[in-house]
C-alpha cells in the first residue's frame, strides 16, 4: 500500500476511502487537490484534512452542524456541477453532502471556525469545494469555545 508523509501523523497509508478531491484546489492552495479526511475517536468530531502531496499542510475542520446547528448551506448551480450533485434539489448539510468549517487556532489561543467558506464534500464521489458565501450572514472568524478535557482522559504525570 502507498504511504504518505505527514507532519502530525508520520507516515500513514493512503486509504482511497478517505480521499477527498478538490478539482480546483482550495483558495490560496489551488495546486493542492487531494486530501485525506482523517477522523480519530479521541478527537471526534474533529476532522483533519491532510494534503497527500504536502506533508506540512493539514487543515482542522468540524462538521458545520457542530458549530452552528441552524447553519443554512447554500450551493450554487456551478458548485453543484463541480460536485456532481443533482441540479434540481437542494441537499441539506450532512445527507448527500458533508459540510465542514475550517478551524483556525491563533497563537494567542483564540480558536475560530470559518462559516463564511465551508468545505462541501459530495459523500458519493468524494469531490469537494470550498464554497464562499458573500451574503454577510456568516463570518470567517466565528469564535469557538473549546470544552475542557474530561478528567478521565487527562494524562497523568510520570512517577
Locate predicted features.
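Long, compositionally biased stretches
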Residues: 2-68, 95-159
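Short active-site loop/helix that positions an aromatic residue
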Residues: 77-89
